[in-house]
Every structure is written in C-alpha cells, then in structure tokens.
C-alpha cells in the first residue's frame, strides 16, 4: 500500500510544522527525478499485478487478525533469496490482509502469459503453508459484516484512540506505524472521524432508518443542527435507507486487483496514462464485486466511493463550508478519486478541450516546475498532487539528500490514490516510467483475476502499437465513475465512450466524438465496423507471434471478459446479491446476518479452491482453465 518506510512516524500535531518543508523538498526531489530520467529509455515491456487477500477463520467466518504474523514468515523467504523468490509479499491496511505480487516483473507478452495464472495459484499455496488448519485466504473485495458486532478473531474493543470508530476496533489496523498514523492523521486533519455514506438496497421489508435503529436505537439517532455529522439531521448519515461507516478501515479494508506497466519512455507513459483514464470506470463496472457493507445489502456494486470517503481528509475550508483562512484551496475531490487532468504527450490525439475540469493546483509548485523546463500539462498534474498535505512523516527521514532520495515526493505521490497513477522511476534504478491501473475489484478465482490482468496488459500494448484513442472530456470520465457504482451497471447502464477509437479530430466540437454506450457495446461492439474492445484485442492478438497454447489460453480469458460484458456471466456483485436474496435466512430486509455470511463465505471458499464450479460466474467449464 503505497510508500512504506521503517522508523517512527509523527502525530498530526507534530507534523504540522514540517508540512511546507516536506512539500518544498518533495518538489526538489521531483525535479531531480525528471532531470535524471527525462531521456530514459527502457527496452523491455515489464509489467506486473498486485492481488490482495483476506484471512478468515473457517470455524466462525470471522476476520483473522494475524496476517502480519504470516507476512513476517513470507518476507523471511524473500530475505533469504531476494533474487530468486517467486513472490513478493507486502503489508496492507488491515491486520487481516496481505498483498502479493510476482517475485520479478513479467517481461513482454507471448508465452509469459501462460505463467500468470500459475503464479497466482502458487501465491495462494505460498500463504497456505503458514495457515492454521482452521484458516483460509480469500480474494473477495469486501468482508460482508465488517463493522458488525464481534466480526474479528480475536475480538477487539471499539472506540479506540486511533480510529475512534463506533464500529471498528483499532486491532483491525496493521501494526506497522504507517497505517495507524494515516488513520489518526486523516481524522485529526479533517477535524473528526471520517463519514462514509452509501445507499442501502431497499427491499420490501427494509425499514427506512434501519442502520440508525441498529446503531443508535433511535429514528433518526439525534435531531439537532450541530456541525457533527453523526448528530446533524441534515447529514447524509441521518437520511433514510443509508449505510453509515466511520473509519478508514471500511475503505482500505477492501481488496483490489491492480496492474502496473513499464513503458519505453516518459512520452509513452504519458500516452498510456491518459488512455487508461477513460477505461478505468469501465473496468470498475466490469469487475464489480462488492455489494454488502456493514452487514447490509447496499444499492451499489463497487468499493471505490467507500475508500474515497474513508480517506477524505479535507476540512471545512477545503470543502467550501467555511472561508479560506488557514488553507489555500477549496478542493472538489477526496485524495482517493478519479484523475483530474490528462497529461498529454507528443501524440496528436490530445486536445486541450478534454481537460474540461476546473483543475485545482498549487501555482507556486507549478511555476517552479515551469521554470525548470517541465511542460505545462505535466507541471499542472504534479502541482495538483501537491495541494495535499503529507500525511505520514517519519521522524528520522525529514532532512535527507534530495539528490539520492525521493521520500518526500513519494509521501505526496503515494497518498494521492487515483484511478490511474503516473509513476516516475525511482532513484539509481534501471526501472523506467510506469503507469498503474488501480480501479479493478479482486475476483474470486485465479482464472478470473488472470483474465483481467492479461486483458489489461494486452490492452496497454495495443494502445501503444495501434495508437488507440479513448479521449473523452474528463468530466465525462467522472460521470462514468459514478455510473460504475450503480447496481448492475455492467448490464443496465450506459457510459460515455468514444465513437471512433482510431481517429484524431484536431478541429470541430468534441461533443461529436463520444456517445453513451452499454458495457456490452463498448466491449463487444455495436456491429458493422464497431467491433468493440474485445474485437480490437482479438485482431491485435492475431498480429502477435503467439504459439497455439498461448493463443488458446488468452482466447479463454478474452471470452470470459466478453461474456461478463454481455451479462452472460454475472458480476461477483450481482451473484452475491442473488445469493443473499435467495438464502432461506434472508428476510428481505437488507440485513445480511451471521448465518447468511457464513454460507456465503463458505461458497466463496468452495469456488475459489475448486470444490464447487458455478457456471453463472465462471462460465462454461470447457472455457475455464484450471
């Protein structure tokens, strides 16, 4: 999870005096990175994936809070064999979470694609070596009853000093200082606990104020006009059919699937960054896998907005609710959100009109970058990141060598969690310019995760080689991200997408370049010359020098994604919703009780380990590769 260092971290009140220093030297470090790497060229197409896992107790289906113990054992393998280890393991926010990546980057496409699924499978096996007989790991996006009574093993006390949550004990937080410091400092910076609000699914027996009744035993909880979001009657948390959550763990405790790609040079990285931005909401909808939160069926299908709200550190001034006295900017988004601007490249496909959002950026940072030869688009991108405060400052890493270190830059960069991330090379490294695709939700099986990993890698190469053009206005990308959260958006809703992905239109109205399409139309085409992204990928694959085995497997992955887009194969969110609604213990009141959760998690385990095959989410067994 982002930039992690060793050492003691500063509490917010101790950090404040260093904020400007960190920002100032972060800019200096950024300029050094650009100066040293602006002409860097890397030959190989290196790439990789990140998969996040949760640990559960098989006896009671509670979250098992000992992932850090298992992680220590896994990382010991890496220390013993740093150059030959098959997998790398890193801490994630939850004490019940582990993040796994390949031990070394994948290189190119071709036969390399045959190893993706086996690598994911061996990752599971690697973790399972250290599990107790009553423990399992799962790749599910959200644990259904997170925040309900006694949902962890061991049990913890709520209202702890770090999160001050009514629902989550501090014991769910990874013991590494970064995570507790992030949690406390976000809360302190914003001036109170985070306030996460999402719509509840309204079933026929769902009470209007169900969450408030369960939480406060009042309807609504407290009626007053104070500024406290938990007591203000106008607050979203007090609205009917609302699910309220109050801690970073509700968001950062969700699991995702991410892919990162090294491009030949800075210009290609800028191109891929821009082209993946409009693709991101589509991938969120296509991978939607989270419909239960805090023990309730929600009316959304994806995690992104929950994480966005869970780390929103904006205070009243930055939210525009009070005059700017102690802060510089009114900021329109959480620091975990969609991108705010394209960064352009030498490609002729970019037009300034696509950046139609009123970008908030630090003009002093922008001017310094401009004065040092950074172009306007890239300067605005980084100056936008620097409107945020650093959240985690290590006490022994404040005064460092800006020529050799990038800690202060990464402090800012790594806590701007956006749908796509533009990643400069680290210092003194052979690593090149990279782009990270971040919105995808983790899937139940290694095949499903491999399908999306492979698809995204081939798409990135196709963007480069075919000069694909997905540009639409940034505001339309934002609308698409909102749409992606809707229940069953993958089959029910329409998204803005470019009509012709092969042409550039240097003149004329950009409104004529895009239209509303379903996910099925975007991926499987509308007939005629419009083959959709699946058709583009299939045509592109035919030009590559794949052997028969690779071609057969890749076509299985592509077929799976095509059927997910058409609705023939259900999304995990839709399947989850139907599982709950058809469960004999469900009372059509939106409540997912312990019995339902136990059966649901057991079904997830059975599918992920191959005990049960469910064609509704896995497709035809003949098309599945195990």
Curated annotation (Swiss-Prot):
GO terms for biological process: cell differentiation; glutathione biosynthetic process; positive regulation of gene expression; regulation of mitotic cell cycle; response to cadmium ion; sorocarp development; sporulation resulting in formation of a cellular spore. InterPro entries: GCS, Gln_synth/guanido_kin_cat_dom. It comes from Dictyostelium discoideum (Social amoeba). Monomer. It holds the Pfam family GCS. Pathway: Sulfur metabolism; glutathione biosynthesis; glutathione from L-cysteine and L-glutamate: step 1/2. It catalyses: L-cysteine + L-glutamate + ATP = gamma-L-glutamyl-L-cysteine + ADP + phosphate + H(+). Belongs to the glutamate--cysteine ligase type 3 family. This is Glutamate--cysteine ligase. Gene3D superfamilies: 1.10.8.960, 3.30.590.50. It comes from the Eukaryota. Disruption phenotype: Cells show defects in prespore differentiation. PANTHER family: GLUTAMATE CYSTEINE LIGASE, GLUTAMATE--CYSTEINE LIGASE CATALYTIC SUBUNIT. Its EC number is 6.3.2.2. The keyword Nucleotide-binding applies. An essential enzyme in glutathione (L-gamma-glutamyl-L-cysteinylglycine, GSH) biosynthesis, GSH is essential for growth and differentiation to prespore stage. Catalyzes the condensation of glutamate to cysteine. The gene is gcsA. It is an enzyme of class 6 (ligase). Signal peptide: none annotated.
């Amino acid at each position: 999870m982002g930039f992690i260092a060793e050492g003691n971290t500063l509490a917010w009140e101790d950090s404040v005096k260093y904020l400007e220093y960190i920002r100032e030297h972060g800019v200096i470090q950024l300029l050094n990175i650009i100066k040293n790497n602006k002409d860097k060229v890397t030959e190989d197409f290196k790439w990789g994936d990140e998969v996040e896992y949760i640990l559960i107790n098989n006896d009671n289906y509670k979250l098992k809070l000992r992932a850090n113990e298992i992680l220590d054992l896994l990382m010991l393998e890496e220390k013993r064999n740093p150059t030959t280890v098959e997998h790398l393991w890193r801490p994630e926010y939850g004490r019940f979470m582990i993040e796994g990546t390949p031990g070394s980057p994948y290189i190119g496409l071709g036969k390399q694609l045959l190893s993706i699924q086996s690598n994911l499978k061996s990752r599971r096996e690697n973790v399972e070596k250290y599990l107790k007989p009553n423990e399992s790991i799962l790749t599910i996006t959200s644990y259904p009853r997170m925040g309900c009574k006694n949902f962890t093993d061991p049990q913890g006390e709520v209202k702890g000093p770090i999160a001050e949550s009514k629902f989550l004990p501090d014991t769910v937080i990874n013991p590494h200082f970064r995570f507790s410091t992030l949690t406390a400092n976000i809360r302190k910076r914003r001036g109170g606990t985070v306030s996460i609000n999402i719509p509840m699914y309204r079933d026929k027996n769902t009470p209007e104020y169900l969450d408030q009744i369960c939480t406060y035993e009042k309807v609504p909880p407290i009626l007053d006009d104070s500024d406290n979001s938990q007591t203000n009657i106008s607050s979203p948390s007090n609205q009917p059919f609302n699910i309220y959550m109050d801690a970073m763990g509700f968001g950062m405790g969700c699991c995702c699937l991410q892919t990162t790609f090294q491009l030949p040079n800075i210009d290609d990285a800028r191109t891929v960054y821009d082209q993946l931005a409009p693709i991101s909401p589509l991938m969120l909808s296509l991978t939607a896998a989270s419909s239960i939160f805090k023990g309730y069926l929600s009316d959304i299908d994806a995690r992104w907005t929950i994480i966005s709200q869970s780390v929103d550190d904006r205070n009243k001034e930055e939210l525009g609710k009070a005059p700017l006295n102690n802060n510089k900017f009114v900021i329109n988004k959480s620091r975990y959100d969609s991108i705010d601007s394209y960064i352009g490249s030498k490609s002729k496909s970019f037009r300034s009109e696509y950046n139609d959002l009123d970008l908030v950026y630090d003009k002093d940072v922008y001017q310094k970058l401009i004065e040092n030869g950074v172009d306007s688009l890239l300067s605005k991108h980084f100056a936008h990141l620097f409107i945020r405060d650093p959240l985690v400052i290590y006490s022994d890493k404040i005064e460092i060598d800006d020529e050799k270190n990038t800690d202060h830059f990464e402090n800012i960069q790594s806590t701007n969690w956006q749908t796509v991330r533009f990643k400069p090379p680290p210092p003194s490294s052979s690593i090149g310019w990279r782009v990270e695709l971040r919105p995808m939700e983790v899937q139940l099986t290694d095949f499903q995760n491999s399908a999306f990993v492979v698809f995204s890698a081939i798409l990135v190469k196709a963007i480069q080689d075919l000069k694909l053009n997905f540009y639409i206005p940034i505001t339309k990308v934002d609308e698409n991200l909102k749409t992606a959260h809707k229940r069953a958006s993958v089959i029910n809703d329409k998204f803005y997408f470019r009509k012709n992905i092969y042409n550039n239109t240097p003149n004329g109205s950009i409104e004529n370049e895009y239209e509303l399409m379903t996910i099925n139309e975007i991926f499987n085409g509308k007939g005629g010359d419009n083959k959709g992204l699946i058709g583009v990928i299939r045509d592109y694959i035919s030009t590559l020098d794949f052997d028969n085995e690779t071609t057969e497997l890749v076509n299985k992955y592509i077929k799976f994604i095509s059927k997910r887009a058409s609705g023939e194969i259900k999304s995990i969110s839709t399947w989850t919703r139907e599982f709950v609604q058809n469960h004999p213990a469900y009372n059509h009141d939106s409540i997912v009780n312990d019995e339902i959760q136990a059966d649901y998690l057991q079904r997830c385990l059975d599918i992920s380990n191959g005990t049960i095959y469910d064609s509704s989410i896995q497709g035809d067994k003949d098309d599945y590769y195990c």
